[in-house]
A protein has these predicted regions:
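Conserved catalytic-core motifs of eukaryotic protein kinase domains, centered on the activation segment
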Residues: 19, 109, 118
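N-terminal start-of-chain detector that recognizes signal peptides
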Residues: 15, 25, 76-78, 104-107, ...
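N-terminal helical cap/lid subdomain that shapes the substrate entry/recognition surface
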Residues: 2-101
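Conserved SAM-binding loop
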Residues: 14, 87, 105-108, 140, ...
Length: 243
């Protein structure tokens, strides 16, 4: 079966935004009198804006509506991110390579749509993507598969012909639960998350520093064929459903 679309996570995958999130999330937690320490930070990697706001709301017994808390979190992030968000060079090379091929691409992130659109516009990446999706549009955030399944429905593509690019444990779990292949480039290996990350179909263990667009494209050539109807592609041989 040939690859027919690629879904990218945003933060830590397409763009080096984790430093900005650390600054804004620290400010968000401190706004309510808390301390955003390292163990808590590791637990929240890949969690998504609304899910993180919900955790803070519960931990500090806050009475503000969840939407209000998420809006504050997003404002703090955009203040930190504008003009300070860099695209990972090899990931930009991969996106442009897919664009030349005419490959449909989308972004599916735990960030709000406002943040996704702002970051993609600020970095010049927005024109490459057919659509963007946020976990805010679904019932459950990653590690549930909801946002990836939403993307598949909107792109009108089967999960099995989609490849997900991810950096987090929650993201890999979500992609696998959606029935999609996933390439992982973890910037952080959270305690207890090693097993999930190693379930990625293609893994760059050292994260973005080790990631190479050319290796991904070569892996795709080995893993997928150009047929619409074969069910298996191994060692360069296509297998027909009737074989």
């Amino acid at each position: 079966m040939k690859l027919q679309g690629v879904i990218f996570d945003l933060d830590g995958t397409l763009v080096d935004s984790e430093p900005n999130w650390h600054v804004s999330d620290t400010a968000f937690v401190e706004h309510f009198g808390g301390t955003f320490d390292e163990p808590w930070r590791e637990q929240c990697i890949g969690m998504g804006s609304r899910a993180f706001a919900a955790v803070v709301k519960k931990r500090f017994n806050l009475h503000q509506p969840l939407e209000e808390l998420e809006a504050l979190k997003d404002r703090l992030y955009l203040d930190a991110a504008r003009g300070h968000t860099k695209v990972f060079p090899e990931m930009e090379k991969l996106v442009k390579g897919f664009a030349v091929q005419g490959m449909p691409m989308a972004v599916a992130s735990g960030s709000s749509l406002q943040v996704i659109e702002a970051v993609l516009k600020d970095t010049g990446l927005r024109p490459y993507f057919r659509a963007v999706f946020s976990s805010d549009e679904t019932k459950n955030a990653k590690p549930a598969p909801d946002v990836f399944l939403l993307a598949a429905r909107k792109l009108d593509l089967s999960p099995k012909v989609l490849l997900v690019m991810e950096d987090s444990q929650h993201g890999v779990e979500a992609a696998k639960a959606a029935g999609m292949r996933v390439c992982a480039l973890p910037g952080v290996w959270p305690k207890g998350g090693e097993e999930s990350l190693r379930k990625a179909d293609l893994l760059f263990e050292k994260g973005p520093s080790e990631f190479r667009a050319e290796e991904v494209l070569e892996w795709i050539d080995r893993t997928y064929c150009q047929c619409d109807d074969c069910t298996l592609y191994e060692m360069g041989v296509c297998h027909d459903p009737e074989d």
